[in-house]
């Protein structure tokens, strides 16, 4: 429910497709919208996620939905919901021109304002802003839409194509945007239809939608009765709100109304939350909104006060109503306060109501009186303040937008408290009260300092004290929010919120210094009364910050920026810590804090952290710029502009988590450690006498420490920037500086600052503290903790954030440190531990002590603190006696850390896994775990590789410790990830030698030169690893496991033999060992495999993909496994992955492909090795892309070789069969891996190892997408392998579990390749074919069938990779799916088939003849009958009839595939394989799952088959059974193609195996576009008869797609008519509508001036029985052709008609 609940029309599809972000801009510029009182304008920004299934070209190419009807309306669309896609693209920046304005006004009077409010952030290509509830403009009038009770949802679309008119990526983006718009309209329409279609009901509709959202949330709560109650309450609230809205909103903007409604929703949610603490995702979302609103308000108190005020007022009203409805009299009063946010808040503050609320209110409404006035004058004021206000708003939005998105993403994972905290913003005051009463009542009283009620709406959720306090903190002061908020909530969300609040505050201060100052003053005043020194202090810092802001001194602004940056960094980095650290300055908060700690949020996803880090980075950059170049900005406006831009850029830019280089990290760590140590020492010396356990003392210590640290950091920053300015001016680096830097680096590495990010955070925090000294030690400690935590978190990238500071810092630091330096140092080197402990722990201990003190003050926390204290004290003591004292305060935290450490292991060397587990499970992120695991795996692999490469060279790899001692080995293992990033930082001696592992080139050279060396080393490693198993040490055990996984011990002999026999150094080592691992256990092997594969993949796919000057693509053999695994390379890979950011899927894809290819290679080699009949050529020049690592030539060679050998030796067959069985033994994988279907298929009785063409690795994308579908998750292995998940798989891991990925990869690869190969073999072998045919037709088990059965059995043994698959005919499906997924291989296969079809059409036919057997096959999954894909001889003949086209196509494909040679054999084999696959697919397709697999094949053929799909049978039929029936009529169906197509249609799931955009391009390249389409068209014509039935449905509402959904009227509105390709857009909208199952979409005749042609095209499509996939393919081909400027740039319709 990311942000869907925020949408008036939530969409599940949307949620899966994109992140919904309710735009704070909702209310912007809508004041004068003049829409009816009942109307509400809802703005929702949807961000398309690149990983979504609908973004995969595969999906669309294989889409078998029937195209919907196209209609044209002249003047009215009576029952049509309408959607207007406004294309904001303009060649010239005319957005501000009257002309464009007028155009927008034509659409809706509200539009220009909304758009201008969004102008600062033009929607990106992957974003669409959905506006609903706009007043209708002339556009509607043209349609006489007045007849339509509802207004069209206006979708603002930034044409994704931009200047790259027709790239596939853009096309898919466009389709997805249209999907979103159409889907929203559909949903809205449904809502409207459910309500009376009256204007007044429009409001009801929104309310109902909100209600629905709420209901959805409640479903999550699973409190039906409660939900009903809430619903009723909510309705009441809505009603009252409506009334109020009618009255007040008439004064206020409609937007406000919307905001209010949403706020109500939030309030309701909050209420619900109050009733049921259960976390509401929605609630979380609402907090986001609240936060946004609040943040916005904070951002520009003076600029947007009116707006905020309105919102606040509205929120207050809403809250009030809500509370009334709730019958919370007290809350009502509070709501009233909210209602009059300014006054209420003030009064509340006076009352000692959570000062946070008061502060928030103040912040929102700097001047209560003004607020009131402002409220009234809001619209005018808004206009007056438009410039600054808008700017501030935009800035705030830009700053907060991504953060909110992240928040929304992360919040769902938050514990209920977190959720509450999120919503706290809304219900802060009321909830504060209730919360205060419940959990934090005393803390509220005690902690008025928590002033985070940014928007009263948030208050609703505030019920949970921690949460409310948390948001309040955010609002009131960055620092204070961090401190107090963290104290109370420390929810990860809180952390982010705090950061956001800080950012908002900063922005607000910058934009309206006076207001900020006032607010600050008020906050200080209000905070003080509560008596929460922390709050006062917090506010004081703000005051410090803001007073200067009065005259807007850049220093103060920068200070604020720095604070924000540090807060963001801390939040992003230490979000978990924050949660854990929810150290309420006062005792009351601690409970909440503890609770939050108890439920550390699962947040801290890389993306969130990245975003926060990015924001912090942007802020820091601005600060640096200002300090360095004071004259850079001529005015505050410039500065704000730059600030806004920077923040937007950094926030929007995809970040890489591990991008920091080790040196820089270490330097940063060192600096931070030095600074912290220095500060701590200073404080320690100052307070040596003071009892560290004394809370006051600890507070003082914390304050002192914070001041010292802040001062240090500020000085550092100032000096640095000063020197920087010199450098900038002089253009050279002062020698002194250089020396200093070098010296510092030399010195500090010993300290090994935990994390550059941390140091940065510290620096920032310190700077902010320095600039705005935190009078509040709590604040300081919080900041420090946050910073520390942030540093650590950053270091870990969300490794451990359990306690913000208390545990999290220690934990994260320890875990990070442990993992990194600390882990090794802690156990390994007392010195390092000492240093680091002093630096890190000491640093932490003060923080901890602060926290502890705070905790003590909080009381509740103290127990926890004390608990952790004992453990951590010892460590502390061991670390540093003095530190220990500090630790006494921090002890609790430290102890917790210690506890964590103890969990980690006394040595802190526990495997990363242990560390992860140690970390708060909730807090510990999957990402962290995956990262750690990946690091561990990579480091292990690297170690092994290094050992193998050169254990004896004297360069002992850091992991040489294998034998030597668990501590060393463990050290590397534990921090494997850290090691990866900073091997040098490893405390353990050898571990420190990050450079020891041989260079890639070195390794490669050595391995190539001395394969025996590798073998020898590997053997030694194996032996050593075996010995290691004896070590009881958990670390050793873990290392041992890793080693064993990396190379399954049982498989070593095979691996060794393979290595010895093979000249394939890389494949031998990597794949052999991977393969063995794979065999050992899919689960266990998977993680290592993943890491290695990832490295492997990265080395190949990434390098080639990333245009790395690496010739790895040429041939896998060129890569030595060692090389791919070296730490260096692993780091590179990880960095690549991280850098890729959005390319994650691609990388994963490559990774999967590489994985599969490596597995296949190793398996093949081993198999060949075992068979003794095939020797794999170590290297083959490769035409194939690196993703296919094994080149086509190599495959062909192998095929020939294998075939020849297999013919020659039966024993080899036996062995190969055994081998294949072994390979299959791991659990089946989702089709994802199919692309690598190069595995020899031992199934065939001949057990010839025929290798399918490697399929593009892009299927992983699909796999990733599939993951969400439960295929992957079904696999039991997933949990186990997830532990071994590589970081690179983190996203996959999240999605479906790495295990699934690996399983899928392996199994898919094996199954697909093996089955396909076997099938091919069968096909190749007449006997086998006959046997296959017999089983199909006769059902008698032929050898082929037996093979298939064996394969199936092996698969089943391996464990149904996917339960779904099992049900679907796992074996077939796997292969099919695999086939499906690799479009290239599919294409090649298809080509083969196509070529083969004519060649082997009979065979195919015979094999395919038994469609029923195919169905049976389904059943026979168990029976293992191998239904052959019955490719009708007629169809085959037809194909033969079109042999040239097919052949040409095939040849083209093959050529593209690099299959050109051996067409007959490979093709036949492939074809046979494909046929087999198809058969399997049939059987599978019966499962539907297989169908997708078939689709995969089809996908390859997608262009050709796309035409076939109609013939394949109505997509609706999509079942193999039907296909089988059709196939019964050989004439009617080209079964294989049909199957493929059908599978395509069936297998939207199969579509999930997306090629990925890149792949699609490649795919297109591989397939001749026009010929393919022509072929397809021909094929379709052939199939046309079959598809006639389909055509009929096409003419009517598509049977398959037909849905209760009503038709939609699509209005396209272009600011610049010549901009978009109207035909292309209409076609894409057609595709989108078809995908949504909309029976008919109407276009405005006046808009589609080429109606005739459009209708002709529609006719053509229906006549050809094209499916959506065919249309899409044609569009893609057209775009490709268009890009190539072919065909004289025919218009799309002309081109399609010509094609037809």
Curated annotation (Swiss-Prot):
Q: Which organism is it from?
A: Homo sapiens (Human)
* Record family assignment: Belongs to the AKAP110 family.
**Which organs or tissues contain this protein?**
Highly expressed in heart. Both isoforms abundantly expressed in ventricle. Also expressed in spleen, ovary and brain.
Q: Which intervals of the chain form a coiled coil?
A: none
What is the name of this protein?
A-kinase anchor protein SPHKAP
* Residues annotated with Phosphoserine modification: 1025, 1085, 1107, 1120-1121, 1124, 1259, 1288
**Protein's gene:** SPHKAP
Q: Which GO terms describe its molecular function?
A: protein kinase A binding
Q: Where is the composition biased (Low complexity)?
A: 768-778
| Entry note about domains | RII-binding site, predicted to form an amphipathic helix, could participate in protein-protein interactions with a complementary surface on the R-subunit dimer.
Its function?
Anchoring protein that binds preferentially to the type I regulatory subunit of c-AMP-dependent protein kinase (PKA type I) and targets it to distinct subcellular compartments. May act as a converging factor linking cAMP and sphingosine signaling pathways. Plays a regulatory role in the modulation of SPHK1.
Q: Annotated region Disordered: where? A: 364-385, 742-778, 793-885, 980-1006, 1374-1414, 1481-1535, 1585-1604
How is this protein organized at the quaternary level? Interacts (via the PKA-RII subunit binding domain) with the RI subunit of PKA. Interacts with SPHK1; the interaction greatly reduces SPHK1 activity.
**UniProt feature, compositional bias: Basic and acidic residues:** 839-855
């Amino acid at each position: 429910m990311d942000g869907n609940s925020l949408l008036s029309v939530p969409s599940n599809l949307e949620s899966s497709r994109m992140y919904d972000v309710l735009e704070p801009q909702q209310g912007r510029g809508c004041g004068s919208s003049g829409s009816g009182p009942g109307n509400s304008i809802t703005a929702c920004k949807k961000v398309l996620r690149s990983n979504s299934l609908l973004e995969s070209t595969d999906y669309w190419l294989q889409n078998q939905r029937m195209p919907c009807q196209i209609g044209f309306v002249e003047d009215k669309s009576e029952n049509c919901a309408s959607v207007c896609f406004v294309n904001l693209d303009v060649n010239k920046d005319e957005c501000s021109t009257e002309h464009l304005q007028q155009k927008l006004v034509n659409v809706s009077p509200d539009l220009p304002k909304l758009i201008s409010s969004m102008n600062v952030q033009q929607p990106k290509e992957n974003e669409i802003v959905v506006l609903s509830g706009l007043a209708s403009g002339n556009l509607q009038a043209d349609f006489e839409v007045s007849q339509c009770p509802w207004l069209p949802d206006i979708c603002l679309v930034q044409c994704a194509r931009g200047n790259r008119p027709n790239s596939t990526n853009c096309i898919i983006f466009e389709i997805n945007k249209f999907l979103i718009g159409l889907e929203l309209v559909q949903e809205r329409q449904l809502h409207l239809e459910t309500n009376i279609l009256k204007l007044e009901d429009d409001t009801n509709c929104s309310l109902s939608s909100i209600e629905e959202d709420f209901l959805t949330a409640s479903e999550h709560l699973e409190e039906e009765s409660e939900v009903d109650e809430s619903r009723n309450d909510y309705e009441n609230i809505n009603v009252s709100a409506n009334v109020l809205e009618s009255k007040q909103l008439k004064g206020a903007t409609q937007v406000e109304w919307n905001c209010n409604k949403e706020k109500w929703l939030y309030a309701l949610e909050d209420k619900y939350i109050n009733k049921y603490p259960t976390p509401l995702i929605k609630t979380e979302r609402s907090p986001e909104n609240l936060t946004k609103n609040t943040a916005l308000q904070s951002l520009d108190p003076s600029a947007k006060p009116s707006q905020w005020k309105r919102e606040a007022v509205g929120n207050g009203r809403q809250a009030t109503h809500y509370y009334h409805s709730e019958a919370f009299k007290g809350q009502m009063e509070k709501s009233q306060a909210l209602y009059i946010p300014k006054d209420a808040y003030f009064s509340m503050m006076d009352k000692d109501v959570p000062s946070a609320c008061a502060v928030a209110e103040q912040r929102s409404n700097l001047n209560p009186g003004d607020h009131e006035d402002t409220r009234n004058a809001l619209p005018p004021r808004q206009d007056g303040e438009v410039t600054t206000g808008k700017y501030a708003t935009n800035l705030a939005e830009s700053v907060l937008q991504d953060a909110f998105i992240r928040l929304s993403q992360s919040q769902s994972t938050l514990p209920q408290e977190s959720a509450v905290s999120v919503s706290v913003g809304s219900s802060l005051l009321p909830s504060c009260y209730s919360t205060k009463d419940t959990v934090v009542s005393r803390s509220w009283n005690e902690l008025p300092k928590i002033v985070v009620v940014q928007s009263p709406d948030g208050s609703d959720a505030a019920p949970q004290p921690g949460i409310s306090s948390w948001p309040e903190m955010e609002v009131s002061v960055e620092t204070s929010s961090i401190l107090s908020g963290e104290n109370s909530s420390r929810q990860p969300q809180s952390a982010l919120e705090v950061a956001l609040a800080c950012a908002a505050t900063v922005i607000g201060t910058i934009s309206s210094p006076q207001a900020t100052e006032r607010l600050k003053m008020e906050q200080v005043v209000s905070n003080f009364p509560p008596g929460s020194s922390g709050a006062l202090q917090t506010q004081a810092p703000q005051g410090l910050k803001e007073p200067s802001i009065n005259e807007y001194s850049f220093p103060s602004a920068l200070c604020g920026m720095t604070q924000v940056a540090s807060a963001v960094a801390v939040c992003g980095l230490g979000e978990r810590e924050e949660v854990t650290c929810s150290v309420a300055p006062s005792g009351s908060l601690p409970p909440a804090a503890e609770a939050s700690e108890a439920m550390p949020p699962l947040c801290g996803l890389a993306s969130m952290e990245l975003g926060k880090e990015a924001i912090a980075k942007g802020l820091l950059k601005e600060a640096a710029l200002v300090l360095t170049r004071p004259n850079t900005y001529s005015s505050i406006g410039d500065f704000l502009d730059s600030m806004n831009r920077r923040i937007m850029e950094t926030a929007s830019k995809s970040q890489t988590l591990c991008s920091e280089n080790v040196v820089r990290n270490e330097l940063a760590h060192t600096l931070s450690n030095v600074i912290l140590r220095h500060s701590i020492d200073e404080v320690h010396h100052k307070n040596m006498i003071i009892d560290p356990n004394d809370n006051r003392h600890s507070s003082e210590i914390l304050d002192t420490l914070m001041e010292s640290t802040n001062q240090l950091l500020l000085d550092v920053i100032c000096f640095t920037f000063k020197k920087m300015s010199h450098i900038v001016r002089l253009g050279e680096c002062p020698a002194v500086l250089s020396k200093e830097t070098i010296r510092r680096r030399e010195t500090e590495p010993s300290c090994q600052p935990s994390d550059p990010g941390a140091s940065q955070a510290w620096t920032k925090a310190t700077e902010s503290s320095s600039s705005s000294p935190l009078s509040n030690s709590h604040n300081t400690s919080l900041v420090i903790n946050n910073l520390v935590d942030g540093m650590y978190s950053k270091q870990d990238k969300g490794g451990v954030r359990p306690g913000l500071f208390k545990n999290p810092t220690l934990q994260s630091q320890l875990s990070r440190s442990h993992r990194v330096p600390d882990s090794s140092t802690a156990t390994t080197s007392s010195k390092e531990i000492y240093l680091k402990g002093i630096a890190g722990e000491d640093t932490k201990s003060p923080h901890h002590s602060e926290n502890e003190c705070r905790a003590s003050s909080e009381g509740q926390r103290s127990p926890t603190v004390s608990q952790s204290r004992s453990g951590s004290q010892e460590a502390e003591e061991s670390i540093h006696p003095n530190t220990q004292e500090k630790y006494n305060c921090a002890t609790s935290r430290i102890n917790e850390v210690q506890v964590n450490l103890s969990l980690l292991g006394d040595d802190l060397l526990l495997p990363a896994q242990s560390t992860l587990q140690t970390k708060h499970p909730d807090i510990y992120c999957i990402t962290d775990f995956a990262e750690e695991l990946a690091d561990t795996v990579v480091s292990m692999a690297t170690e092994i590789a290094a050992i193998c490469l050169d254990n004896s060279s004297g360069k002992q790899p850091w992991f040489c410790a294998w034998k030597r001692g668990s501590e060393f080995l463990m050290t590397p293992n534990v921090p494997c990830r850290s090691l990866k990033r900073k091997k040098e930082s490893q405390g353990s001696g050898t571990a420190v030698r990050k450079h020891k592992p041989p260079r890639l080139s070195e390794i490669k050279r050595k391995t190539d030169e001395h394969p025996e060396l590798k073998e020898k080393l590997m053997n030694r490693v194996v032996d050593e690893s075996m010995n290691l198993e004896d070590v009881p040490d958990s670390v050793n055990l873990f290392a041992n496991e890793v080693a064993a996984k990396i190379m399954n011990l049982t498989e070593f002999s095979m691996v060794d033999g393979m290595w010895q026999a093979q000249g394939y150094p890389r494949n031998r080592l990597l794949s052999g060992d991977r393969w063995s691992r794979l065999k050992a256990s899919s689960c266990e092997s998977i993680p290592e495999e993943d890491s290695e594969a990832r490295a492997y993949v990265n080395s190949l796919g990434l390098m080639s993909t990333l245009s790395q000057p690496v010739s790895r693509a040429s041939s896998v053999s060129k890569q030595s496994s060692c090389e791919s695994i070296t730490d260096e390379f692993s780091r590179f890979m990880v960095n690549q992955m991280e850098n890729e950011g959005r390319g994650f899927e691609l990388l994963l894809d490559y990774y999967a492909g590489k994985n599969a290819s490596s597995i296949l290679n190793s398996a093949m080699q081993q198999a060949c090795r075992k068979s003794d009949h095939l020797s794999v050529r170590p290297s083959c020049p490769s035409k194939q892309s690196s993703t296919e690592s094994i080149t086509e030539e190599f495959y062909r060679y192998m095929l020939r070789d294998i075939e020849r050998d297999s013919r020659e030796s039966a024993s080899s067959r036996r062995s190969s069969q055994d081998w294949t069985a072994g390979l299959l033994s791991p659990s089946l994988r989702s089709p994802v891996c199919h692309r690598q279907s190069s595995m020899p298929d031992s199934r065939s009785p001949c057990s010839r190892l025929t290798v399918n063409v490697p399929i593009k690795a892009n299927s992983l994308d699909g796999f990733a997408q599939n993951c969400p579908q439960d295929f992957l998750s079904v696999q039991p292995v997933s949990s186990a392998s997830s532990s071994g998940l590589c970081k690179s798989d983190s996203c996959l891991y999240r999605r479906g579990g790495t295990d699934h990925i690996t399983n899928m990869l392996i199994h898919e690869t094996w199954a697909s390749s093996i089955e396909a190969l076997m099938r091919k073999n069968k096909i190749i072998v007449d006997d086998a074919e006959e046997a296959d045919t017999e089983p199909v037709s006769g059902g008698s088990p032929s050898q082929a069938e037996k093979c298939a059965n064996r394969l199936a059995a092996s698969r089943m043994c391996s464990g149904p990779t996917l339960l779904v698959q099992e049900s679907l005919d796992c074996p077939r499906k796997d292969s099919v799916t695999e086939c499906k997924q690799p479009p290239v291989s599919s294409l090649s296969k298809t080509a083969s088939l196509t070529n083969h079809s004519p060649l082997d059409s009979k065979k195919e036919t015979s094999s395919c003849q038994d469609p029923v057997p195919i169905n049976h096959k389904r059943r026979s999954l168990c029976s293992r009958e191998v239904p052959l894909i019955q490719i009708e001889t007629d169809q085959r003949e037809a194909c033969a009839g079109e042999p040239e086209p097919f052949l040409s196509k095939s040849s083209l494909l093959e050529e593209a595939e690099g299959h050109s040679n051996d067409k007959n054999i490979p093709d036949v084999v492939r074809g046979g394989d494909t046929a087999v696959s198809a058969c399997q697919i049939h059987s599978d397709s019966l499962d539907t799952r297989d169908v997708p697999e078939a689709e995969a094949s089809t996908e390859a053929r997608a262009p050709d088959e796309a035409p076939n799909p109609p013939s394949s049978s109505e997509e609706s039929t999509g079942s193999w059974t039907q296909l089988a029936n059709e196939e019964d009529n050989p004439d009617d169906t080209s079964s294989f193609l049909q199957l493929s197509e059908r599978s395509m249609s069936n297998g939207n799931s199969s579509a999930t195996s997306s090629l990925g955009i890149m792949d699609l391009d490649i795919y297109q390249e591989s397939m001749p576009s026009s010929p393919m389409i022509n072929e397809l068209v021909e094929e379709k014509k052939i199939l046309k008869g079959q598809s006639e039935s389909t055509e009929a449905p096409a003419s009517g509402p598509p049977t398959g797609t037909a849905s209760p959904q009503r038709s939609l009227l699509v209005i396209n509105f272009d600011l610049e008519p010549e901009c978009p390709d109207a035909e292309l857009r209409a076609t894409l909208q057609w595709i989108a509508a078809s995908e949504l199952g909309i029976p008919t979409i109407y276009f405005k005749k006046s808009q589609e001036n080429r109606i005739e042609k459009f209708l002709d095209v529609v006719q053509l499509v229906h006549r050809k029985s094209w499916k959506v996939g065919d249309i899409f393919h044609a569009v893609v081909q057209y775009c490709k052709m268009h890009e190539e400027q072919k065909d004289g740039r025919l218009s799309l319709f002309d081109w399609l008609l010509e094609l037809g």
